[in-house]
A protein has these predicted regions:
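RecB-family 4Fe-4S metal-dependent nuclease core
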Residues: 1-292
Length: 292
């Protein structure tokens, strides 16, 4: 399927440019331009996708909300063991509040709701325990922010002013190292967050690198709001939590080595971001369906 970009497309695209492009909106275009057209331009959803993803999205929202509330009181301070004693006491109350926010009764969850409840609790416990282990092993952990909304206005060549935005799940400082972290309820591996250092363009060409694109865009946004010299950016996947924090990395042979986000990385990402937005606005490039 091929769709030509008509005036109505550009009118809606300009609205998005004013309200803001998110990482998920841009990676939906990378995944399949026709899906981007349907969801962002026409604002309709594939009901099969909605049905498939609703449980995962609900659980993800519950975990994010609960962790946000659990850590919010401790933002900006060095965490100690006593803090985790209090966090653990608040685990069930905050989980129930997060559950109610998703319009799910917690009085006696059954069936799929019971599974969502128990799995959410399991992941929250693992996350808190992981942080406690760091502290007990002598690491200095400071939560700088949770659920941080970032936005910025950028000037894209040939396009003009465009707004971008994103919600960063967690920004912390571990033994002095700034970390920009995105939580994922689905599985993630190093290959999803790593790229060949000579091929930044893969970020806008291969949806398998969507997670790398996301953490780089969060880093780019953060740098525009709070400039930094270097930072680590990565994923914590609840599905394969045992892998721990999975940072953005460069491919080195058959393995991946963590790459700190510095000025050069941000400049390379900016070029990819600009080119992707320019493609969206290019009337000569039609929307062509990709196999998903």
């Amino acid at each position: 399927m091929v769709i030509k970009k008509e005036s109505s497309y550009f009118e809606r695209l300009q609205q998005i440019a004013v309200s803001g492009f998110s990482p998920s909106a841009l990676t939906s275009y990378v995944r399949n331009p026709i899906d981007f057209y349907a969801s962002k331009i026409l604002r309709v959803s594939d009901m099969e996708d909605v049905e498939e993803n609703i449980a995962a999205n609900t659980m993800g929202s519950i975990i994010h909300e609960a962790l946000d509330k659990l850590y919010q009181p401790y933002v900006g301070r060095i965490l100690i063991k006593a803090d985790f004693d209090q966090i653990k006491k608040q685990m069930l109350p905050e989980l129930e509040v997060a559950y109610q926010k998703e319009y799910i009764s917690t009085s006696d969850p059954v069936g799929k709701n019971k599974i969502i409840y128990e799995v959410s609790l399991h992941y929250i416990k693992k996350m808190v325990q992981s942080d406690l282990d760091l502290v007990q092993n002598g690491c200095e952990l400071i939560i700088k922010s949770v659920e941080r909304k970032l936005e910025a206005e950028i000037k894209v060549p040939q396009i003009g002013k465009v707004k971008i935005h994103g919600m960063v799940d967690r920004i912390d400082q571990l033994d002095g190292k700034l970390r920009i972290i995105d939580y994922k309820s689905g599985a993630t591996d190093k290959g999803n967050v790593g790229i060949d250092p000579e091929d930044f363009n893969i970020l806008s060409g291969d949806y398998k690198k969507a997670k790398a694109f996301q953490v780089l865009m969060y880093s780019y946004l953060y740098s525009l709001n709070e400039p930094f010299t270097e930072a680590s950016a990565g994923i914590i996947s609840f599905k394969n939590f045992d892998q721990g924090y999975i940072p953005f990395a460069f491919k080195a042979g058959r393995s991946y080595q963590e790459k700190m986000i510095d000025v050069e990385v941000l400049q390379n990402f900016e070029q990819v971001l600009f080119a992707l937005i320019q493609e969206l606005f290019n009337k000569e490039i039609h929307l062509t369906e990709k196999p998903v």
